[in-house]
From Swiss-Prot:
Record text on subunit structure and interactions: Homodimer. Heterotetramer of two MnmE and two MnmG subunits.
Cofactor(s) this protein cannot do without: FAD
Family: Belongs to the MnmG family.
Binding site for NAD(+): 273-287
Predominant location: cytoplasm
PANTHER family attached to this UniProt entry: GLUCOSE INHIBITED DIVISION PROTEIN A, PROTEIN MTO1 HOMOLOG, MITOCHONDRIAL
Compartments in which it is found: Cytoplasm
Alphabetic keyword roster: Cytoplasm, FAD, Flavoprotein, NAD, tRNA processing
GO molecular function, one term: flavin adenine dinucleotide binding
Protein name: tRNA uridine 5-carboxymethylaminomethyl modification enzyme MnmG
Lineage, highest ranks first: Bacteria, Bacillati, Bacillota, Clostridia, Thermoanaerobacterales
Binding site for FAD: 14-19
One GO BP: tRNA wobble uridine modification
Amino acid sequence: MNFIAGEYDVAVVGLGHAGSEAALACARLGLKTVGFAVNLDSIALMACNPSIGGPAKAQLVREIDALGGEMAINTDKSLLQIRTLNTSKGPAVRSLRAQVDKKLYQMNMKYTLERQENLDIKQAEIVDILVEDNKVTGVVTKLGAIYKCKACIITTGTFLKGRVIIGDVSFDSGPSGLFPANQLSETLKRLGFKLMRFKTGTPARVDKRSIDFSKMEIQPGDEVITPFSYMHDKIEIEQLPCWLTYTNKRTHEIIMANIHRSPLFSGEITGVGVRYCPSIEDKVVKFPHKERHQIFIEPEGLNTYEMYVQGMSSSLPEDVQLEFLRTVPGLENVRVMRPAYAIEYDCIDPTQLKATLESKKIEGLYFAGQVNGTSGYEEAAAQGLMAGINAAMKLLNKPSVILDRSQAYIGVLIDDLVTKGTNEPYRMLTSRAEYRLLLRQDNADFRLTELGYKIGLVTEERYQKFLKKKIQLEKEMRRLLGVMIKPSEEVNNFLISKGSTPLVTGVDLYTLLKRPEIDYKSTKFLDKNRPDDILDSVAEQIDINIKYEGYIMKQLRQVEHFKALENKKIPEDIDYYQIHGLSNEAKEKLTKIRPTSIGQASRISGVSPADISVLLIYMQQLRRNKEDEEQIG
């Protein structure tokens, strides 16, 4: 029998990476919030890799942090190792990647949720969503408890009708042996949502004591740790190494000899898998001429012998897994602690959502994370934060917060999902961002902290810290224009030592720093009046802003054109089938997606430049008609 168990402003269903950010955002903005997890020990569960960040993902984490989210802070608290990737490439693609202690990450996030004012967390499976007059009014647990709410955020990850597959064995399950959420999937279907079936997988976890690391290449962390969060200036820990090894011909032979036992190729798995994170059997089949594949051995935590075998995700039978693992140098005597598995799950077609991540069908119902067809902890957390912010803004009668593609990777992520949709698990890539030189991990605070402060998530402490950095950067950039460097033996010897051309005439230091081989820190001895308190992060900004000034200005001009199209708003009630000249496909797609601007309409698959021209002419006619009516009136 059902009973009223409580009344809240917001209910968050699922407390993984998306749900944790959503719940914290709502509670911190003053809304009475309740969060549900099938098991409270699964909060912020890292069901796959023990790492945060990497290309494009690090940018997301920094953006979450700049807006006042939790992921970066929690990563720094749980750190085992950190490295900066792509250091030999340009700043647009440089990114941090942190190895974290999985259990510590979960415990820290759970404690953060427990301590948060306005937030209750409960262990329960949500099976139904209550709707009246097309508005969310509550959620129902498996035990019949009704929690009334004005907004609900669905962040169920891979739990919806989860099914684990290992060889010819399959069973209903969420990730890591947790219960699946089967009834909620049926509820969403009943409410009219189109569901898709996706698949992901995870590699085996092996016993550290059974590994011969002498046959592998050590992968240490950076000598100087760069924190993920802008709130942390320094982190001092003894870092744990990762290890690199490779598959070989024998590994591939075993996989191919047993490929008929792979559910991926037998038809047992019907869900669409992750393109950019293929299983080992997928790699061997698709790249038959490749002699070896990289395998990284990563620690799962400080207080465990479990090691994560990155690059060997598989759904082959357990006996085959052990056989091919033992062909890898260093793993000849390996003991498997947890076998690799694939997991299929339901997710929604994200084109059913607005850019706020609110459902177009039901008011007050939001979706975030893997349930929207994405993959990755970082992508989930970013969506969770924005869904939480927008649910709160709506209930507080404040304007929605929609980041555009020129502001943040978060904007690219959400725009791609709601405009284009996805037919496979969506992963954030730097190549997806048109303005990636503007959307670097080093400047996320400059892009988003003031917005986060205006929203109410950025604390006064964080805001003052940011302002100090901003003022210091602006003052130092101006000062460098007035620092004259004259040719001298000392100066020219320095330039020659850096592989740079000697000076013939004097030049300001700002101009000298445009040379790629000269960095700001190395010129301190030439700059007698340089302040002693320049932050490392400011020094980094100076180098990037000066060296890439021309490219940055070019992208800013491109953004002006982009903004012009984004600012051409399309009326909500427009009937595309009444517009003569639009192709039938465009009418269908525009009606389904209902873009809010010409810019968004132009990014919809199936809408051609000719269709956009027709739409622009139609909107000009609408505007003229409105002006004529106003003059007559």
